């Protein structure tokens, strides 16, 4: 009879829970194998984008510890160390990997009875009511929410494999909702509401190298972007820069939370939720979960290095929202241009990846992976998505010569031209539809102005995929000189196709031709 294996409380160092891609295919591995074989792994294969986004931050923080890139006497020394590590391409030092994972072994167990990974064991007493495992899984409906991804109900909770639960735990900590939550009582004070996770509704951009080893090193923020101790409170009161699993004490839920004081806390310690998973008897699955508030106040803000920051009307900076209908290429100029013509900022992580700061081979293979979660600011989750760019070295390579920025500026002009053509086409189709469908007795300007009809939606669904293909063709050729006429011609073709069914009727032909000039003028303007 085979002996039962010892209970390791689902040790994340050795249990297979992180999906990765290699030349042999996809598989799942633990933290130890991930770091030891990172230079032989192509990249992560996490199917849940919000989990992939959060996991990248966790892994980059661990990589910083293992390589000592979490410390820096000055920026030049830090850049030199990273350059040498990338150039050697030998992977992470095995002894450093084992030393780090060994030091924090008990904190890297998903179901550890004392300090489970990224969880708060105090919730056993402070929050006796459970939230349900459905609440943990963002794709499952909970409470009275609508069913989108599967038929799950609160009356019948379906257990989740522990390997999957670890990923959903990370996703909740970074993208969790605000508003009502399972109540928690601390020192006699009971509250049942929380604020949103730090990345809620955001679009996160991560540099991607030829291997996971390169990707993790490229994803460690440079010293010039680190938050500094003392910015979130009186000098000398800020805690040391650490990850949650490294700290000896759990934070006081009723005290004001500390801000980020360095790269480690900036990457891993911005959560606003407290979570505790309830494992099944075999600890191979999660059968219940408690999700509640971690602090009564928001953490002090900081500039996340993986987000695009746009300037609002009042001059403040705000992270760009994730929009499922907006393709990655439309954000490309905001990724590559350091000066966009306003006070907006590209992701700070890209500022340290220009030519000369990393080896040439790594630079010429550099891509960007994007992870987005289209949500509102409270509880509604729409959909999540991921995308990747081709190599960006031609756009990121800049110098003091003005000619080096021509292609990057062309990307911006191309995107603006595509959006202008889309807006003009949509407006023209709305106008044509109103002219075609307005009753003769009400055929006056301003009537039924809100009705756009079905044409704009049909046209935009055809336009954006075709515009994306045309954009990449222009980028490949390195020429955006005639971008407006190119996208205008595409918009005109789609306008004609969508309105063709009514062109044979007098009223339809009149409506069609009356608005067609709005799109046709793009061709005239681009050639004038």
Language-model features, listed with the residues they occupy:
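Short functional micro-motifs and their immediate structural scaffolds
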Residues: 166-169
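Beta-propeller folds
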Residues: 148-151
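Short Cys/His-rich metal-coordination motifs, predominantly Zn2+-binding knuckles/fingers
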Residues: 161-164
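Flanking scaffold residues of small Cys/His-coordinated metal-binding clusters
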Residues: 153-156
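Extended alpha-helical scaffolding segments
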Residues: 1-144, 171-528
């Amino acid at each position: 009879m085979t002996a039962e294996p010892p209970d390791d409380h689902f040790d994340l160092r050795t249990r297979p829970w992180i999906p990765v891609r290699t030349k042999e295919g996809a598989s799942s591995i633990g933290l130890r194998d991930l770091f030891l074989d990172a230079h032989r792994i192509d990249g992560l294969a996490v199917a849940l984008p919000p989990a992939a986004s959060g996991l990248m931050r966790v892994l980059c923080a661990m990589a910083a510890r293992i390589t000592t890139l979490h410390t820096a006497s000055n920026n030049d020394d830090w850049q030199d160390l990273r350059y040498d590590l990338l150039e050697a391409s030998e992977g992470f030092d095995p002894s450093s990997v084992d030393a780090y994972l060994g030091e924090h072994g008990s904190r890297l167990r998903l179901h550890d009875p004392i300090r489970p990974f990224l969880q708060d064991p105090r919730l056993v007493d402070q929050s006796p009511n459970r939230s349900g495992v459905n609440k943990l899984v963002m794709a499952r409906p909970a409470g009275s929410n609508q069913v989108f991804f599967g038929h799950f109900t609160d009356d019948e909770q379906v257990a989740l494999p522990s390997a999957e639960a670890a990923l959903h735990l990370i996703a909740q900590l970074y993208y969790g909702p605000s508003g009502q939550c399972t109540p928690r009582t601390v020192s006699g004070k009971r509250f049942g509401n929380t604020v949103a996770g730090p990345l809620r509704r955001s679009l996160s951009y991560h540099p991607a190298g030829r291997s996971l080893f390169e990707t993790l090193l490229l994803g460690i923020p440079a010293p010039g972007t680190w938050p500094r101790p003392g910015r979130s409170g009186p000098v000398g009161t800020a805690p040391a820069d650490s990850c949650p699993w490294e700290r000896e004490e759990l934070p006081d839920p009723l005290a004001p939370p500390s801000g980020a004081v360095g790269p480690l806390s900036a990457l891993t310690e911005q959560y606003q939720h407290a979570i505790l998973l309830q494992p099944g008897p075999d600890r191979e699955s999660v059968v219940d979960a408690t999700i509640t508030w971690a602090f009564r106040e928001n953490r002090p803000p900081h500039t996340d290095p993986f987000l695009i920051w746009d300037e609002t009307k009042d001059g403040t900076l705000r992270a760009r929202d994730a929009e499922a209908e907006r393709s990655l290429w439309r954000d490309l100029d905001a990724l590559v241009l350091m000066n966009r013509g306003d006070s907006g900022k590209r992701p700070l992580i890209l500022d340290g990846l220009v030519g000369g700061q990393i080896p040439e081979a790594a630079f010429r293979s550099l891509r960007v992976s994007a992870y987005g979660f289209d949500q509102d600011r409270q509880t509604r989750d729409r959909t999540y998505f991921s995308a990747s760019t081709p190599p960006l070295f031609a756009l990121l390579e800049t110098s003091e010569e003005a000619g080096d920025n021509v292609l990057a500026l062309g990307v911006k002009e191309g995107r603006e031209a595509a959006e202008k053509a889309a807006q003009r086409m949509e407006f023209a189709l709305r106008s044509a539809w109103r002219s075609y469908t307005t009753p003769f007795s009400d055929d006056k300007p301003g009537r039924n102005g809100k009705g756009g009809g079905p044409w704009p939606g049909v046209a935009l669904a055809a336009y954006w995929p075709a515009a994306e293909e045309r954009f990449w063709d222009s980028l490949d050729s390195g020429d955006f000189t005639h971008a407006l006429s190119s996208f205008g011609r595409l918009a005109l073709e789609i306008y004609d196709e969508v309105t063709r069914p009514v062109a044979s009727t007098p009223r339809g032909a009149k409506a069609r031709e009356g608005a067609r000039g709005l799109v046709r003028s793009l061709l005239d303007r681009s050639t004038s």
